[in-house]
Amino acid sequence: MSAWVLPDHIADVLPSEARHIEELRRGLLDTARSYGYELVMPPLLEHLESLLTGTGEALDLQTFKLVDQLSGRSLGLRADTTQQVARIDAHLLNRQGVARLCYCGPVLHTRPDRPHATREPLQFGAEIYGHPGIEADIEAVLLSLECLRSAHVQEVSVDLADVRIVRSLLAGLPVGMHQLAQVHGALAAKDASELASLTRDFPSASREGLLALLQLYGDAAVLNEAENLLKPFPGAREALSDLRAIAARMDGVRVTFDLADLRGYAYYSGARFAIYAQGASDALVRGGRYDEVGAVFGRNRPAAGFSLDVKQLVGVVSAPSLRAAIRAPWGDGGALSAAIATLRRQGETVVCVLPGHGSEVDEFHCDRELVLVDGNWVVKAI
């Protein structure tokens, strides 16, 4: 195999795309900061138990594992940053009130999580800890929408669901893990006959409620129908009320609901959302409430947030035009170097042409040049 061939679903990022990614990264972090979120930078490598305790099988399978040559302990390359930020909130910051944290860094996956995806996403996310109320959920959704607006993403739509609905329908039932997984699978596939078979011994209210979920997807009218069908279940009613409150704050955005959507069931503890956009084959943003995320670190704080892959975002957002540069001759100092330094401090890109390379073309289009006129270095159009 050639030495330059990279592993499957791993790629170099070349200059034009790298510039676009970096501009998006800066814009996302600036947007999060404008909401009061503080930047943290967890390590790419951690002890395996810190990365995986309480996260479920899916993240375990996505995590690259190795042995620490210093300690002999098992290490993991993070496949998701949320667990690390929860550790930071629980043990390093240890604040009593609200903590707003954001991050942006690479994660590694053993397998791509969607067709044609990279196994090295650049994950951006924002999380708010310490507030159990619906306000934190709303802020997470609004911030994620503002992040997409800052990136000039067009025609977004938000899909809402809440794991508490299914949990309330199953509460108190003697359902084993295997049967629970089968019920979840039938709900995800919207397979009414399979779900009816699996729930034939359930109490009628729970059985009818679960079967009704298969039809409860669409616009806000779904919530009205669900409230009528799920009256015997207080947890479901609370979840529906929260979904209505979240949707009410999203002016000018198309909002849909799928009350049988169980993605992240083992992870989320309340409302969850996914944001789609024109040109994207999958959700650009996923987030929600995950109050149990810090429990494994001994500090079970309320938490809500979201994450996205900046590399995926690049695929649906046009790169802004690169500002034309100024071409300048190579010099050893004096007035020429001073003129170049002044232009760069003013925000201009000045490309010095090295000896023997005057006719070469690079990524930076130069529409001006620095020339010597009457003993002074001045900028002229090419």
Curated annotation (Swiss-Prot):
<dbReference type="Pfam" id="PF13393">
    <property type="entry name" value="tRNA-synt_His"/>
</dbReference>
<protein>
    <recommendedName>
        <fullName>ATP phosphoribosyltransferase regulatory subunit</fullName>
    </recommendedName>
</protein>
<keyword id="KW-0368">Histidine biosynthesis</keyword>
<keyword id="KW-0963">Cytoplasm</keyword>
<comment type="subunit">
    <text>Heteromultimer composed of HisG and HisZ subunits.</text>
</comment>
<dbReference type="InterPro" id="IPR045864">
    <property type="entry name" value="aa-tRNA-synth_II/BPL/LPL"/>
</dbReference>
<dbReference type="GO" id="GO:0004821">
    <property type="term" value="F:histidine-tRNA ligase activity"/>
</dbReference>
<dbReference type="GO" id="GO:0000105">
    <property type="term" value="P:L-histidine biosynthetic process"/>
</dbReference>
<comment type="similarity">
    <text>Belongs to the class-II aminoacyl-tRNA synthetase family. HisZ subfamily.</text>
</comment>
<dbReference type="InterPro" id="IPR004516">
    <property type="entry name" value="HisRS/HisZ"/>
</dbReference>
<comment type="pathway">
    <text>Amino-acid biosynthesis; L-histidine biosynthesis; L-histidine from 5-phospho-alpha-D-ribose 1-diphosphate: step 1/9.</text>
</comment>
<keyword id="KW-0028">Amino-acid biosynthesis</keyword>
<comment type="function">
    <text>Required for the first step of histidine biosynthesis. May allow the feedback regulation of ATP phosphoribosyltransferase activity by histidine.</text>
</comment>
<dbReference type="GO" id="GO:0005737">
    <property type="term" value="C:cytoplasm"/>
</dbReference>
<dbReference type="GO" id="GO:0006427">
    <property type="term" value="P:histidyl-tRNA aminoacylation"/>
</dbReference>
<dbReference type="InterPro" id="IPR041715">
    <property type="entry name" value="HisRS-like_core"/>
</dbReference>
<dbReference type="InterPro" id="IPR004517">
    <property type="entry name" value="HisZ"/>
</dbReference>
